[in-house]
C-alpha cells in the first residue's frame, strides 16, 4: 500500500472517513472511449497491450490526466492470469475471451498449469511505472472473481446464461470446486502482484455472478471469492467487491470479507445501503445509459445518485457498469467537475 495515497479522498471514503472532496472514478475509464487510447493501441492486440508494461501504464494514466478522476484503475484484462499461467486464451474482437480448449472434466482441471510468481513480473513492472507517476492519486488493482473466470473456462467463450458452469456445480461439485479454487488462486496472485507493487486498493469484479441465485452463490461461489481475497488481506488495502445484476447477492458479496460494496445501476444506493444494514461504504452507480442523454437529465441523475449514496457510511461515485465505448469523453470530464463541485456532506 502506497503511503502517499492514505489521505486521498478515495481511500478516505473507502475507509468510511470524510473526504475533502467527493471521490469519483469510472469502471473502464481507461480504454475505448478515449481517442488517445485508440492511438496507442493501434496495431497492438488487446492482451499484448496488457503485457507491455510501458503501454499498460500509459493507458492506465490517460483518464487521470484527462478527467481529473480520484483514482486510476489498472489497465488489464480478467483473463491475463490465465494467459500468464499458460492457458491458451485470446480476446477475439467482437466476441471476447475465447479459450483454445474449454475446461469441463476433472482431468481438464488437473491438467491446468499453475500460475507462477515470476510470470507476473510484467504486471508488477506496469504498476511500479504507474504509481511512480500518479503521486498522491491512488491506483486501484483489480482481478476477475473466480466464478467469472471459471465460467469463461467452462464455456470456452462468453455466454448469456452460463448454463455450463451452473450445471457443473450441481452435476460434479468436486470438479467445480477444484476449478473455482484454481481460479481463486490465479486471481488472488494477480491482485497481490498489483498491491505489492504499489496499488492502494483492490477490486474483485464478478461480471457474471448475476446469473446465480443466492443459494448457489453462497454454496459454490462465495468460498472461492473469499479464497481469492485471502491472498491479499494481510496487505491492509481496502477491498471492493462488484458484480453486475447482483442486487440479491449484496450481503453475501460483502460477507466474503470486503470493505466496500460496488452496486450496479439497477438498485438505488439508499436501498442497497438498507439491505446491507448500513455496514459498509458503497461505490456506484450512475447509469451508463444516461451518459448519452441530454446534460440536464444526466446532471439530475448524478445528483440523485449522490443523494441516495449519502445514506451509506461512505460513498465513492462510479458508474453502475463500465464506460460504454461510444461515450463522449467530454461528458465524463463534465460529470467529474459536477461531482467535485458538490461539497462533501
From Swiss-Prot:
Sorted alphabetically, which InterPro entries does this protein's record hold? UROD/MetE-like_sf (IPR038071), Uroporphyrinogen_deCO2ase_HemE (IPR006361), Uroporphyrinogen_deCOase (IPR000257)
Keywords assigned by UniProt, alphabetized: Cytoplasm, Decarboxylase, Lyase, Porphyrin biosynthesis
Query: What are the residue positions of the site described as Transition state stabilizer?
Result: 77
Q: What's its top-level EC category?
A: lyase
Which PROSITE patterns does the entry mention? UROD_1, UROD_2
Statement: the UniProt record of this protein carries the keyword Cytoplasm: yes
Q: Which GO terms describe its biological process?
A: protoporphyrinogen IX biosynthetic process
Name the residues that bind substrate. 28-32, 77, 152, 207, 321
Among Gene3D superfamilies, the record links this protein to: 3.20.20.210
Q: Where in the cell is it found?
A: Cytoplasm
Q: Which GO terms describe its cellular component?
A: cytosol
Q: Name the pathway.
A: Porphyrin-containing compound metabolism; protoporphyrin-IX biosynthesis; coproporphyrinogen-III from 5-aminolevulinate: step 4/4
A GO molecular-function term, please? uroporphyrinogen decarboxylase activity
Question: What does it do?
Answer: Catalyzes the decarboxylation of four acetate groups of uroporphyrinogen-III to yield coproporphyrinogen-III.
PANTHER family recorded for this chain? Answer: METHYLTETRAHYDROFOLATE:HOMOCYSTEINE METHYLTRANSFERASE RELATED, UROPORPHYRINOGEN DECARBOXYLASE
Q: Family per UniProt? A: Belongs to the uroporphyrinogen decarboxylase family.
Q: HAMAP family this protein is in?
A: URO_D
Oligomer and partners: Homodimer.
How is this protein named in the record? Uroporphyrinogen decarboxylase
Amino acid at each position: 500500500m502506497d503511503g502517499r495515497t492514505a489521505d486521498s479522498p478515495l481511500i478516505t471514503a473507502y475507509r468510511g472517513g470524510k473526504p475533502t472532496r467527493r471521490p469519483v472514478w469510472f469502471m473502464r475509464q481507461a480504454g475505448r472511449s478515449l481517442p488517445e487510447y485508440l492511438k496507442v493501441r493501434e496495431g497492438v492486440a488487446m492482451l499484448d497491450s496488457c503485457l507491455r508494461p510501458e503501454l499498460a501504464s500509459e493507458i492506465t494514466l490517460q483518464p487521470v490526466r484527462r478527467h481529473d478522476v480520484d483514482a486510476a484503475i489498472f489497465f488489464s484484462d480478467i483473463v491475463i492470469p490465465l494467459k500468464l499461467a499458460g492457458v491458451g486464451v485470446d480476446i477475439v474482437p467482437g466476441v471476447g475471451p475465447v479459450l483454445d480448449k474449454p475446461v469441463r472434466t476433472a482431468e481438464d482441471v488437473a491438467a491446468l498449469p499453475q500460475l507462477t510468481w515470476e510470470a507476473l513480473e510484467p504486471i508488477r513492472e506496469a504498476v511500479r511505472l504507474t504509481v511512480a507517476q500518479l503521486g498522491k492519486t491512488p491506483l486501484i488493482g483489480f482481478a476477475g472473481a473466480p466464478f467469472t473466470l471459471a465460467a469463461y473456462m467452462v464455456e470456452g467463450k462468453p455466454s448469456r446464461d452460463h448454463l455450463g458452469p451452473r450445471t457443473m456445480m450441481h452435476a460434479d461439485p468436486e470438479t467445480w470446486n477444484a476449478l473455482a479454487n484454481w481460479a481463486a488462486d490465479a486471481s488472488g496472485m494477480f491482485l497481490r502482484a498489483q498491491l505489492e507493487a504499489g496499488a492502494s486498493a483492490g477490486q474483485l469484479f464478478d461480471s457474471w455472478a448475476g446469473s446465480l441465485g443466492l443459494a448457489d452463490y453462497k454454496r459454490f461461489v462465495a468460498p472461492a471469492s473469499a479464497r481469492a481475497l485471502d491472498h491479499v488481506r494481510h496487505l491492509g488495502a481496502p477491498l471492493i467487491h462488484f458484480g453486475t445484476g447482483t442486487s440479491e447477492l449484496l450481503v453475501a458479496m460483502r460477507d466474503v470479507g470486503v470493505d466496500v460494496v460496488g452496486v450496479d445501476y439497477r438498485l438505488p444506493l439508499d436501498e442497497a445501503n438498507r439491505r446491507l444494514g448500513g455496514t459498509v461504504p458503497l461505490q456506484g452507480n450512475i447509469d451508463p445509459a444516461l451518459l448519452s442523454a441530454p446534460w440536464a437529465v444526466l446532471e439530475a441523475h448524478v445528483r440523485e445518485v449522490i443523494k441516495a449514496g449519502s445514506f451509506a457510511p461512505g460513498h465513492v461515485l462510479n458508474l453502475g457498469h463500465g464506460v460504454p465505448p461510444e461515450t463522449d469523453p467530454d461528458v465524463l470530464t463534465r460529470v467529474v467537475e459536477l461531482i467535485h463541485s458538490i461539497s462533501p456532506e
